[in-house]
Amino acid sequence: ILFAMGGPLVLHVIIPRIDTLVGADNNNPSPEEIKLLEQDPYYARLVKSFIPIQYAANIYACYLTARKETSLLDKVLLGMSMGAINGIAINTAHELSHKASSLDHLLSHLALVPSGYNHFRVEHPYGHHKRAATPEDPASSKMGETFYEFLPRTVIGSFKSAVEIEGARLKRKGLSFWSKHNELLQGWSLTGIFHSSMLGISGRGAVPSLAVQSAYSIM
């Protein structure tokens, strides 16, 4: 059980504790240093290297859920641990979604595949950044709004926004929403392939873990 719930423990207990012990770091790079750092490929490689680690962890978790001795509780806890990893991957996707390269956009989608949150790749750079902190932005919380009020509004609203944005982009090019060039359909197809593969490897026993990890990562 302790191993299965390792993700939430690290994310919500150990890292915040270390953060408190280390304290605030007030040393920020200068504008000149930032320009040099942006040109250093090390940081881009560091971000991208998380994706194969993410997939290896998800595949291993599916292997564990396929074992007969793995209890339902352990499957749920494993799902939470994978949700913690795939939630971090949404941050990875965020960084890559702002790049101009189509390869980076594909990698952004791959990072979002386990969570199934692929519409984020479209909505965040083209919707949220355009309307941030305005009433029209589903990704900005309202004053006094609780987390549980904000969560369904942002998930549903961001999904609708992404569909509208991608539909408008395709329309400008004279293409149908159902075109093979639809980035949302491409991302959702990858998600379908991933989850079908995990079920094929682990069987129906993986359903609780896969469902929990997806929900937990988005939260």
Regions found by a protein language model. Give the residues of each.
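Alpha-helical bilayer-embedded segments of polytopic membrane proteins, i.e.
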Residues: 1-20, 42-64, 73-86, 179-219
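Cytosolic juxtamembrane amphipathic/interface segments immediately preceding
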Residues: 33-39, 170-175
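Membrane-helix interface/capping segments
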Residues: 20-36
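Internal transmembrane alpha-helix with an interfacial aromatic "cap," most often the third helix
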Residues: 58-65, 127-133
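Membrane-interfacial segments
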Residues: 25-26, 30, 65-69, 93-101, ...
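Juxtamembrane helix-loop boundaries in multi-pass membrane proteins
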Residues: 36-47, 139
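Membrane-embedded catalytic scaffold of the fatty acid hydroxylase/desaturase
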Residues: 48, 76-191
